[in-house]
Amino acid sequence: MSQYLIRHNEPLEEDELVFLQKKEQRELKQYYRFFRILMFLSFILPFAGTWYSASDGNPDPFTPGKFFAVTGILLSISGFVTWVGYRRGPGKLHYDITHRTKTIEQTHISRKVYMPQNNTYHFYLNSPNMLSIEVNNTDYHRMKEGDEVNIEYTTKAKIYLGYF
């Protein structure tokens, strides 16, 4: 049994592409919600600081320079956080959709596990990308440890698509 990593890219099938597009829509919706919350806080927190300063008896709680400096810093932090969040989440998914490729990796079964709690069957793999996959009853009993299995996942986002 060879332990070399064998993988290649193939084009996405139509149903896989539709699945990824729906997943991208859901992730973008969450991303934009998070973005709006950060932008809202970037403008509200300086006002809250001004109100707090006024409640302490400060005769001139609002100074435009300080207000815009704090707002600018918060906007910069929010912008950086949302950019990193996009690059790590929806950005990778968008890359996979636009390039329309998936990776097929040839790996071997290192261990078979039955989970009686939820009546599922799993193969643990020798793959650096997937630790385990859920399989059906037939494949679980047909294949044995050391057998070769091919797994499919998106190239950049590493979203599991199936096995054969």
Short names for language-model regions:
Residues 135-164:
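A membrane-cytosol interface segment of integral membrane proteins
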Residues 114-116, 132, 140:
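Short acidic, S/G/P-rich loop/turn micro-motifs used as interaction or catalytic elements
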Residues 14, 19-21, 95-103:
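N-terminal topogenic membrane-targeting module
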Residues 1-33:
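Cytosolic juxtamembrane N-terminal segments of multi-pass membrane proteins
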Residues 114-126:
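Short aromatic-glycine-enriched beta-strand elements
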Residues 22-97:
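Alpha-helical transmembrane spans
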